């Protein structure tokens, strides 16, 4: 499984809102943003590209509990959205994937989320996914 395996929900495609061929963002959002914790992690890592953070630091920076974000970090690492590596002390640190396509789509997601109508569509999708479990 990777960051681009799930298709858009068919409702409110981002492509239709932007008119600029953002179907890859549709796929990425639908396949990866299953919670607002996932959203927060993605935005944090994209805004701090190249910076790695361990679980405790990330939780502190996001104002979330470690148990809230740990499963999201594991899922993102498994999908290739982020890279995880253990340091010499054994502490795992996370950074946005070095894959240029993942970085491009993450950057585009953050840009698009600044537009109210698009952000509301993203919120609707996350809520729908959360309600499905």
Range-by-range predicted roles:
Residues 104-133:
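Amphipathic alpha-helical dimerization/coiled-coil segments
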Residues 63-79:
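Short amphipathic alpha-helical interaction segments
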Residues 33-40, 53, 67-71:
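Short, well-structured alpha-helical interface segments that form or flank functional binding sites
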Residues 1-9:
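N-terminal acidic, proline/glycine-rich, low-complexity intrinsically disordered segments
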Residues 11-40:
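Short alpha-helical segments that sit at the start of domains
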Residues 31-35, 46-51, 78:
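Short helix-capping/hinge SLiMs at alpha-helix to coil transitions
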Residues 41, 51-61:
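Short acidic, hydrophobic short linear motifs in intrinsically disordered regions
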Residues 32-36, 84-110:
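Short, cationic-aromatic polyanion-contact patches
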